[in-house]
């Protein structure tokens, strides 16, 4: 048995997002976003046809939820402001009901000793802006900067930790390469432009925050999937893994921390003649406006081998033209989500930030496991005994602790998520929360065994294992 103690004032908590938790009520003034729209078009694409209007009803239950956060040991909590709730058309008029809701929500958190961390964009493009191209359009960058400035003005007295994007690679992958987010295109030229505009928008908002006299910190949340070559002694596998890393990790990590794009990526997009449209002064903006704080979402690694399968010319070019995914035998799996569990990956990411990214201040902003059918684990008192989740978090925290001991500037750990929430097209198929949500009983909340356990970890600022 070993005692793992974390640094003083360590952030213990969880993360969620507006579109995955808030739900809608008839007179809330919220505008349409791409998820509302896609669900209206194709409800059958969503598990059990549960759409974004339902979710976990945080809009009306947030006071109860904050008490449950307190009961589960949170000292910090991240959510996002829904752009389409605050500014229903994406630009123009502000919805005062949204202002009241978010101010009340953030105040409730603070009054209960929980610091709100607020993300500005979580895959939820307002529909009127998507109809003009979404992140493909320069207009969206300008609209986003105005929206962010409104958020800083309206909530800056309550919120001191801001994030420009959550997982900005996901709208690129889902919306413009692999068809799991609206608008479901397959077009690498568009994907490059979308990623470029997201990076530019982030830098512009960071500049606005720093120049606005605000007294907090601003960063970005990136899902980092370390790319491991099949054979570290095979130069072709190593090269393929480096390219995958440039596409999926460094495309946002390098601009956010170093103010520049990875050379491997620049060479590929130049060679393919799919360079984004760049305006004069853009690259200086990106170079000069880097983050204060990095949020790291870690779920799984990426296993890569040199390209062996034929290139699919129907959709060429694609990132996958440069590598194949490697199905490593005997890996540990979460069978419900189909994801590999590789705890050391979290240590490798943190070590990378220390060795190659100036030991930037960072925290684990998401880590967790989704499990289907958790009602199987309900005990006689109605509590879900999710020992598998406790084991998952413990095993990852051991590696976080090791990285900190070695000098990594990691200041917190947030699990995904607080209460079971709506996971996009998967809806409520896989449950991730410390707190169960019973959709059949009007979203009734029950703390799981992991939530009670997490409170002891937070109170002791560590654990024995």
List the predicted regions and their residue ranges.
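N-terminal, well-ordered alpha-helical segments
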Residues: 60, 67-70, 100-103, 107
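Catalytic domains of carbohydrate-active enzymes, especially glycoside hydrolases
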Residues: 61-82, 289-293
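Active-site region of glycoside hydrolase catalytic domains
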Residues: 1-46, 89-91, 99-465
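Aromatic- and Gly/Pro-rich amphipathic surface segment
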Residues: 32-67
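Glycine-rich, proline-tolerant flexible connector loops at the mouths of alpha/beta enzymes
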Residues: 81-94
């Amino acid at each position: 048995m070993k005692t793992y103690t974390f640094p003083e004032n360590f952030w213990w908590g969880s993360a969620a997002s507006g579109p995955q938790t808030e739900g809608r009520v008839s007179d809330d003034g919220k505008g349409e976003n791409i998820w509302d729209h896609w669900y209206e078009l194709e409800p059958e694409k969503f598990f059990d046809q549960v759409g974004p209007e339902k979710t976990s009803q945080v809009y009306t239950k947030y006071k109860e939820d904050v008490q449950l956060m307190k009961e589960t040991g949170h000292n910090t909590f991240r959510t996002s402001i829904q752009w389409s709730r605050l500014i229903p058309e994406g630009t123009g008029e502000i919805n005062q009901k949204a202002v009241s809701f978010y101010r009340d929500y953030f105040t409730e958190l603070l009054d209960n000793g929980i610091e709100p961390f607020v993300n500005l964009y979580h895959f939820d493009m307002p529909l009127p802006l998507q109809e003009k191209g979404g992140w493909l359009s320069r207009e969206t960058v300008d609209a986003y900067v105005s929206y962010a400035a409104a958020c800083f003005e309206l909530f800056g007295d309550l919120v001191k930790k801001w994030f420009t994007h959550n997982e900005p690679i996901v709208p690129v992958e889902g919306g413009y390469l692999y068809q799991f987010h609206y608008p479901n295109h397959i077009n690498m030229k568009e994907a490059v432009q979308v990623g470029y505009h997201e990076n530019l928008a982030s830098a512009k908002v960071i500049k606005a925050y720093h120049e606005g006299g605000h007294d907090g910190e601003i960063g970005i949340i990136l899902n980092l999937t370390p790319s491991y070559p099949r054979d570290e002694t095979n130069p072709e596998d190593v090269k393929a893994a480096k390219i995958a890393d440039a596409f999926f990790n460094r495309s946002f990590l390098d601009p956010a921390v170093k103010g520049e794009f990875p050379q491997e990526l620049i060479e590929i997009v130049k060679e393919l003649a799919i360079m984004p449209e760049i305006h004069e002064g853009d690259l200086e903006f990106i170079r000069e406006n880097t983050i204060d704080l990095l949020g790291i979402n870690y779920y799984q690694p990426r296993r890569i081998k040199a390209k062996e399968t034929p290139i699919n010319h129907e959709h060429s070019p694609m990132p996958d033209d440069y590598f194949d995914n490697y199905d490593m035998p005997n890996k540990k799996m979460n069978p419900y989500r189909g994801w590999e569990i590789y705890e050391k990956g979290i240590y490798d990411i943190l070590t990378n930030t220390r060795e190659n990214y100036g030991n930037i201040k960072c925290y684990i902003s998401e880590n967790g496991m989704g499990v289907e059918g958790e009602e199987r684990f309900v005990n006689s008192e109605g509590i879900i005994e999710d020992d598998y989740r406790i084991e998952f978090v413990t095993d990852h925290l051991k590696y976080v602790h090791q990285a900190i001991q070695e000098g990594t500037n990691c200041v917190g750990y947030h699990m995904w998520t607080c209460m079971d929430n709506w996971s996009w097209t998967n809806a409520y198929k896989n449950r991730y929360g410390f707190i169960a949500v019973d959709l059949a009983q009007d979203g009734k909340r029950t703390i799981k065994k992991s939530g009670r356990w997490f409170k002891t970890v937070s109170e002791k600022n560590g654990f024995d294992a």
